[in-house]
UniProtKB/Swiss-Prot annotation:
It is found in: Nucleus. It comes from Homo sapiens (Human). It comes from the Eukaryota. The lineage of its organism: Eukaryota, Metazoa, Chordata, Craniata, Vertebrata. The modification Phosphoserine is found at S121. The modification N-acetylthreonine is found at T2. This is Spliceosome-associated protein CWC15 homolog. GO terms for biological process: mRNA cis splicing, via spliceosome; mRNA splicing, via spliceosome. InterPro entries: Cwf_Cwc_15.
């Protein structure tokens, strides 16, 4: 929006402005919009996903590192369990130290066992994801190969049909092909006036009729028979 119509609170006066003591000098008035605003060039940072940077990145390794960091953060935020009773002062026995007779499916697991179980489950999930990815890639490759093979077969079929339809001898051998017609089509200029003018015009006697051709007219025929032949 323009500010040209707004009033000036401090109009410019020659030689009487700020820092102007000489009346012979021209008055100078500056605005904040006249000052340079962008004095530095902005460069692309390393974290702005440049094409070269994206090509050189290992997304699988970064994903695995983020998963491990998230697991460590989750384990760090988990509150430690403190037991006030005298029976729970000592640490819980490990799973391998518990006799087989005392094992029960309802017994809770320790923190270390829980961490090991989570790491194993994460590894299993990663392996399952990679296997699913390889399966999808293989299915897409097979689908692409099948489509290319079908396209080649269709092109070959069309080419053979064109070859067979272009040869009339081969068309006659096919029972499903319609009977070919070798009759010569009548030309469009068969009944024009100036075609074969002197061919067989005197063999038969015809009734007098008007012909728009001086060489085929009755007067010309009589004149040629009388004075030329």
């Amino acid at each position: 929006m323009t500010t040209a119509a707004r009033p000036t609170f401090e109009p410019a006066r020659g030689g009487r402005g700020k820092g102007e003591g000489d009346l012979s000098q021209l008055s100078k008035q500056y605005s904040s919009r006249d000052l340079p605003s962008h004095t530095k060039i902005k460069y692309r940072q390393t974290t702005q996903d440049a094409p070269e940077e994206v090509r050189n990145r290992d997304f699988r390794r970064e994903l695995e590192e983020r998963e491990r960091a998230a697991a460590r953060e989750k384990n760090r935020d988990r509150p430690t369990r403190e037991h006030t009773t005298s029976s729970s002062v000592s640490k819980k026995p490990r799973l391998d130290q518990i006799p087989a007779a005392n094992l029960d499916a309802d017994d809770p697991l320790t923190d270390e066992e829980d961490e090991d179980f989570e790491e194993e489950s994460d590894d299993d999930d990663t392996a399952a994801l990679l296997a699913e990815l390889e399966k999808i890639k293989k299915e897409r490759a097979e689908e692409q190969a099948r489509k290319e093979q079908e396209q080649k077969a269709e092109e070959e079929r069309i080419r053979m049909e064109n070859i067979l339809s272009g040869n009339p001898l081969l068309n006659l051998t096919g029972p499903s092909q319609p009977q070919a017609n070798f009759k010569v089509k009548r030309r469009w200029d068969d009944d024009v006036v100036f075609k074969n003018c002197a061919k067989g015009v005197d063999d038969q006697k015809k009734d007098k009729r008007f012909v728009n051709d001086t060489l085929r007219s009755e007067f010309h025929k009589k004149f040629m028979e009388k004075y030329i032949k």
